[in-house]
Amino acid sequence: FFARSKTTSLTLQDADDIRALPTVRLVIPRQQRSMRMIYKKEFTTTRVYGVTPEWQAARSWELSDGEFFTDQDMQRKRRVIVLGATPAKKLFGDKDPIGKMVRVGDASYQVLGLLVEKGLTESGYDPDDRTLIPLTTSMSRLTHQTHIHSAKVMALDPSMVEKTMEDVRQL
């Protein structure tokens, strides 16, 4: 389930507090913003998510090439990016983007990896139209906000979801 911030009060400390609950297996805090990305003369607008390295495992989303960012990238607030298939195709066509620099907002980011293409959903939603950067980089360089927009919370066991949701509400 997701814990969402209706105000600007959900923080990384809140995510840590949720993570410490005995029924919680994983917490993935995130920020989200729609941004224009540029590579040479090509450009696109896509969703940029600031997430933690655990995002990939929590979402069970494999990489088709390259690698995901690390805890060290988070600590250093590195300008690195993992591209979804849609922005990768729009910016690079059939060319290999790994190691290339793309512009997001007013800064350049090095492409580390490519997410496996999922394809359009039945409702027409494109889950591949996204990019991922370290959450700390998003907070300090992109959104300039100290709060997070939401956090994906995974209970230790499906039977614990209701209890976990109640515990999160109590915080």
Roles of regions detected by a PLM:
Residues 49-73, 77-171:
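Mid-to-C-terminal secondary-structure elements
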